[in-house]
Amino acid sequence: MRSSFRRLIRSRDGVSAIEFAIILPVLLTILIGIFQFGTAMSNYLVLTNAAAKGALTLALSRGTTTPYTSTTAAINAAAPNLNTANITTTVTVNGSTCSSDSACLTNLLAGKTATVRTTYPCSLVVMGTNYAPSGCTLSAQTAQMVQ
């Protein structure tokens, strides 16, 4: 009986499986965290590109009747992977914020600055833990000279 007990104590069978079971949750947490961060970074790049497309569209909209509508449409078209209902857009022309076509039309003067700021909510939840409990918001801003 003593010899079988000694053999059991000295045996290394199953040690690798136990070590793997101990380290697996840590590895999964790191892997899922990398995935979440990658998704947030991808969303940020798409949002930045959408803001740039919107600012360019706005800067080239002098002389058209729908500069604000064209700008928001360009932003939504440039962000196909994002939920466009959650994208918040702020359009500023010549220092004045505009939220309609008529408001933008009066301020679109050649040589002035057209600025588009976009924001989008993000989620940083990894394995049930929210790493941004107060909320995470991605934002991008681009300015162009009105042509």
Which residue stretches match the model-derived regions?
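Residue-level preference for short coil/turn positions at secondary-structure junctions
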Residues: 10, 110-112, 138
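Short amphipathic secondary-structure patches
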Residues: 49, 54-119
